[in-house]
């Protein structure tokens, strides 16, 4: 929490000391996920689809430029609650195209291909282009390959923070708040470096399982793939992902998880109530009570840790999630 407050403070400082030399020159042309956009001025009625997109904009101090947000798996960061309260919420779930258009947007940015793209349940980018509205998709999701039959695709190499920095820099340029963007990026870089230094001597290259959720106790586990943000967290903490699938969000049987025998199990904390095992305490209860799963060494040794579920997505919360797990590892003497 302290690091997030520091991050927010840095952005506030950037408001006071913004360098006019770095101001955006309009028209601004940007390329994003194969699309070229031109902005003649900063958007005034943006719609953020996805929690990460919304929180990036709020951290950049853009609440007055936001017409609405949608799709929130967890509550907003506490230090952003006041700003967020000033922005219309369409829904915490998947919005309709009609509800988005009703806000009269002049820019639509999305976190996930589920919310914007050729296979989206909401809209294709062409739906907005035809109306003269620019759209944007998180670069972290553009980097996945759509070859798995899953909307999130697969990732050929380990995700890293550079893709998040690209997104922050793009948003800062679009809205002409570059100094704030630079402050955010520098804060993240310092925090990642500190974690890597702390866990550089981690012994044994421990394997991590990142369990997001399951529809029911009898269902397979929905987990972070090898090269996903979860894999990045494992890497930062001196280990590796126990899941070898390159799919971004594979569903894996418990038989396969038992065979992988992870050293550490990280369970997602979610505020939504979509699936039976969304809540962290329900996941922990399952791990400890299932006859087979409870025999995993990680379970018997108590190496089960809770992390913000949004951190398992490639978001501004990913590093925060790494910090959460790091604190629990240190408390257990596993760093």
Residue spans of the language-model regions?
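Structured C-terminal subdomain patch of bacterial secreted/periplasmic proteins
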Residues: 155-167, 266-335
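Solvent-exposed loop/turn segments at secondary-structure junctions
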Residues: 52-56, 72-75, 107-108, 113-118, ...
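Extracytoplasmic ligand-binding site segments that recognize negatively charged/polar headgroups
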Residues: 115-123, 133-170, 203-229
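Alpha-helical, coiled-coil/dimerization segments enriched in small aliphatic residues
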Residues: 74-75, 221-249
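Short helix-initiation/N-cap motifs at beta->coil->alpha
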Residues: 30-34, 87-98, 246-254
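A short, structured surface patch at a secondary-structure boundary
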Residues: 48-118
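Bacterial Sec-exported substrate-binding components of ABC uptake systems
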Residues: 2-6, 18-55, 157, 170-211, ...
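Second-shell loop/turn segments in exported
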Residues: 43-44, 86-87, 111-115, 150-158, ...
